[in-house]
Every structure is written in structure tokens, then in C-alpha cells.
Amino acid sequence: MADTTGRIPLWIIGTVTGLLVIGLIGIFFYGSYSGLGSSL
């Protein structure tokens, strides 16, 4: 996979990163509202 890292379009990386960040934030807030986020 080291050969394909330089060939991946930046917009794909940005989109995937954005979705992961939004997903993590969503899970964090959902967990905190459910009472599970207090352990974090």
C-alpha cells in the first residue's frame, strides 16, 4: 500500500477524514447523552 499513498486524490482523503471526524464527534455526543460518555 506504500505505492498507492502518493496516488490517492486529496479530496478522497479529505472526505474520508471529515466523515471519520464527524462520526467520532457524533458517537461521542451520543455516548455522553446516553451516559456512556462519562467514562471517556
Curated annotation (Swiss-Prot):
The chain crosses the membrane at residues 8-28. One of its GO terms (cellular component) is chloroplast thylakoid membrane. It holds the Pfam family PsbJ. Keywords: Chloroplast, Membrane, Photosynthesis, Photosystem II, Plastid, Reaction center, Thylakoid, Transmembrane, Transmembrane helix. It is a single-pass membrane protein. InterPro entries: PSII_PsbJ, PSII_PsbJ_sf. It is found in: Plastid, Chloroplast thylakoid membrane. GO terms for biological process: photosynthesis. Its main location: plastid. PANTHER family: PHOTOSYSTEM II REACTION CENTER PROTEIN J. PSII is composed of 1 copy each of membrane proteins PsbA, PsbB, PsbC, PsbD, PsbE, PsbF, PsbH, PsbI, PsbJ, PsbK, PsbL, PsbM, PsbT, PsbX, PsbY, PsbZ, Psb30/Ycf12, at least 3 peripheral proteins of the oxygen-evolving complex and a large number of cofactors. It forms dimeric complexes. One of the components of the core complex of photosystem II (PSII). PSII is a light-driven water:plastoquinone oxidoreductase that uses light energy to abstract electrons from H(2)O, generating O(2) and a proton gradient subsequently used for ATP formation. It consists of a core antenna complex that captures photons, and an electron transfer chain that converts photonic excitation into a charge separation. NCBIfam families: PRK02565.1. Belongs to the PsbJ family. This is Photosystem II reaction center protein J. It comes from Ipomoea purpurea (Common morning glory). The lineage of its organism: Eukaryota, Viridiplantae, Streptophyta, Embryophyta, Tracheophyta.
